[in-house]
């Protein structure tokens, strides 16, 4: 089983734009690739051009087993490993779909759209394109027809039995903000790429901070756990250009708890005071 997983990983590692659950990759990798692609485009074309955003419906539940087996036959040259891979896929009945959250499934679905990736990069000669699992971006130069390119990409995806979500797929001029994987990207007139985190995350973070106060008062949460939770939320926004959001959340925390969330010593001192009071 381990050898099979390593084979899947080796088969997918070369598709560097497919950032998901591989060592050194993930959403941070995908964000960095998109920023680099936007800067590369800006140095040559300014803000002229468009970005195509594509999302697939039911990416895991609807994947074709037949198409996966074709990939196995091409990439897994060891027949024993190929049989193990086929058997893993066949654990899902009906000829379609793979389970979420299972490592072999993740490896399969990282590599599965590679034919589409190669089509975009090689046959369509698009320099700036990438994806995070089923979320694709394709940056189209101003001398190319974005609608035509999108139609070709959709046709290629459908040949792999992938269903494009028409409601989530669109063409956006680079002069306007766009969302990719729930993050907002803005290419400014100076070529700077501004990234903002998911705005709904701010509302959730505010609710959680207020709820943590009740948990602390009821003894359901320690100050060490509070430190971990709050700074995890702040770290998410600190990874974006969301300085003002971070400041507002820190101010809310101070108004609720009466101390700054920036130093772990503040949490430990408050925890010791509570222990003394309880004793």
Locate predicted features:
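Polymerase palm active-site segment centered on the conserved acidic dipeptide of motif C
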Residues: 128-131, 138-215
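Glycine/proline-rich, flexible active-site/cofactor-binding loop segments
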Residues: 1-24, 85-92
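Hydrophobic recognition helices of helix-based DNA-binding modules
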Residues: 3-4, 120, 186
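Conserved polymerase palm-domain catalytic core
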Residues: 32-133, 137-152, 172, 223-242, ...
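Beta-rich nucleic-acid/ligand-interaction surfaces
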Residues: 13-29, 137-140, 171-177
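A generic secondary-structure signal for well-formed alpha-helical elements
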Residues: 3-7, 72, 76-80, 157-161
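Active-site and adjacent loop segments of nucleotide-processing enzymes
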Residues: 183-279
């Amino acid at each position: 089983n381990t050898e099979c997983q390593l084979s899947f990983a080796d088969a997918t590692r070369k598709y560097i734009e497919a950032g998901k659950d591989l060592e050194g990759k993930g959403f941070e990798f995908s964000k960095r690739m998109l920023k680099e692609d936007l800067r590369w485009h800006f140095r040559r074309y300014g803000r002229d051009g468009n970005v195509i955003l594509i999302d697939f419906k039911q990416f895991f539940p609807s994947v074709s087993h037949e198409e996966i087996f074709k990939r196995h036959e091409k990439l897994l040259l060891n027949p024993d490993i190929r049989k193990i891979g086929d058997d893993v896929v066949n654990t899902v009945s009906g000829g379609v779909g793979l389970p979420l959250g299972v490592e072999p499934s993740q490896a399969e679905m990282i590599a599965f759209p590679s034919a589409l990736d190669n089509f975009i990069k090689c046959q369509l000669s698009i320099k700036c394109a990438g994806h995070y699992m089923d979320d694709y971006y394709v940056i189209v130069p101003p001398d190319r027809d974005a609608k035509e390119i999108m139609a070709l990409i959709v046709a290629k995806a459908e040949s792999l039995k992938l269903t494009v979500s028409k409601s989530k797929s669109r063409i956006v001029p680079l002069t306007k903000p766009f969302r990719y994987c729930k993050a907002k990207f803005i290419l400014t007139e100076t070529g700077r790429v501004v990234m903002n985190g998911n705005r709904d995350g701010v509302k959730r973070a505010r609710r959680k901070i207020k709820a943590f106060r009740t948990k602390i008062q009821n003894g359901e949460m320690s100050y060490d756990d509070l430190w971990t939770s709050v700074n995890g939320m702040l770290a998410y926004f600190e990874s974006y250009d969301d300085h003002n959001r971070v400041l507002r959340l820190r101010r809310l925390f101070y108004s609720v708890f009466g101390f700054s969330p920036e130093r772990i010593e503040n949490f430990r001192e408050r925890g010791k005071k509570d222990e003394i009071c309880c004793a």
